[in-house]
């Protein structure tokens, strides 16, 4: 078998084991996907900041105007993903080992989201919301 079919089989098994139980947590995953654009700018809290660092004076005023745009862009990107899947990728993913919607959706999500380095929970949420 060629590399592409092996990759599709591995992704298919992975989605069956990992993503299938997530159907029950649909509301939680939607909430996570909406919160990620808000939480992401605060990742500086994970790393130790310099001693002269003051988040309220330097970071917070620049983040607040971005939050509504981040939420709206996340929802817009979800719709764009849906259009990409329906009209562009779905006809291309008709190989024998990729006949499940979970597998196809994960492949498309990896192609679409890789350039944007979006966090994985957004991909999982869109998979569950649209196709599972």
From Swiss-Prot:
Highest taxon of the lineage:
Eukaryota
Q: Which UniProt keywords apply?
A: Membrane, Transmembrane, Transmembrane helix
Q: What's the protein's topology in the membrane?
A: Multi-pass membrane protein
Q: What is its main location?
A: membrane
The answer on whether this UniProt entry bears the keyword Transmembrane helix reads yes
Transmembrane portions of the chain: 28-48, 59-79, 106-126
Entry's Gene Ontology cellular component terms: membrane
Q: Where in the cell is it found?
A: Membrane
Q: Could you tell me what this protein is called?
A: Uncharacterized protein SPCC1840.13
UniProt organism field: Schizosaccharomyces pombe (strain 972 / ATCC 24843)
Biological classification of the source: Eukaryota, Fungi, Dikarya, Ascomycota, Taphrinomycotina
């Amino acid at each position: 078998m060629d590399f592409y079919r092996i990759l599709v089989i591995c992704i298919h098994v992975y989605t069956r084991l990992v993503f299938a139980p997530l159907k029950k947590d649909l509301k939680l995953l939607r909430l996570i996907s909406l919160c990620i654009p808000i939480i992401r700018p605060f990742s500086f809290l994970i790393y130790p900041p310099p001693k002269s660092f003051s988040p309220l004076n330097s970071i917070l005023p620049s983040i607040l105007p971005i939050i509504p745009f981040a939420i709206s862009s996340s929802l817009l990107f979800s719709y764009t993903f849906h259009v990409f899947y329906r009209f562009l990728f779905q006809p291309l993913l008709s190989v024998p080992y990729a006949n499940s919607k979970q597998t196809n959706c994960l492949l498309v999500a990896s192609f679409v989201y890789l350039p944007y380095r979006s966090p994985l929970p957004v991909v999982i949420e869109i998979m569950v919301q649209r196709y599972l």
